[in-house]
Amino acid sequence: MTVINTLSNALSSLYNNEMRRNKQAIIMPSSKLIVNVLRVMQKEGYVGEFEYIDDGRWGKILVQLMGRINKCGAITPRYSLTYREMISLPDYIRRYLPSKEIGVIIVSTPKGVMTHKEAARQRTGGIVLGYVY
């Protein structure tokens, strides 16, 4: 079976396991982008520790869930935003987050994967990947 969007599959797997009240989630196939998104989610306190398991094929990621994810998902198509658009992100916040203070939009920038708040602080634009709250 062909996997079209691995990031979308990973985020929906996290959300589904969270809704089933599981303590762990296994994400496969893994990629560097998924690991970087998980680091951002871990720094924001949405997931616990995670580890890469090499199975000789694509690899798996075992993620410890903390019960803090209400909703998460990938934003498709992946829009490119400039710094000025990153500061005034009201369309994306209104569409994907319940309020300005709750949740984050995950952005891939030239300085790495980070939240939309960090990207605005560092004065950089990037590509919108997903959201979590």
UniProtKB/Swiss-Prot annotation:
InterPro entries: Ribosomal_uS8, Ribosomal_uS8_CS, Ribosomal_uS8_sf. Belongs to the universal ribosomal protein uS8 family. It comes from Metallosphaera sedula (strain ATCC 51363 / DSM 5348 / JCM 9185 / NBRC 15509 / TH2). Part of the 30S ribosomal subunit. It comes from the Archaea. The keyword Ribosomal protein applies. SUPFAM superfamilies: Ribosomal protein S8. GO terms for molecular function: rRNA binding; structural constituent of ribosome. One of the primary rRNA binding proteins, it binds directly to 16S rRNA central domain where it helps coordinate assembly of the platform of the 30S subunit. Signal peptide: none annotated. One of its GO terms (cellular component) is ribosome. Transmembrane segments: none annotated. This is Small ribosomal subunit protein uS8. HAMAP family: Ribosomal_uS8_A. Keywords: Ribonucleoprotein, Ribosomal protein, RNA-binding, rRNA-binding. One of its GO terms (biological process) is translation.
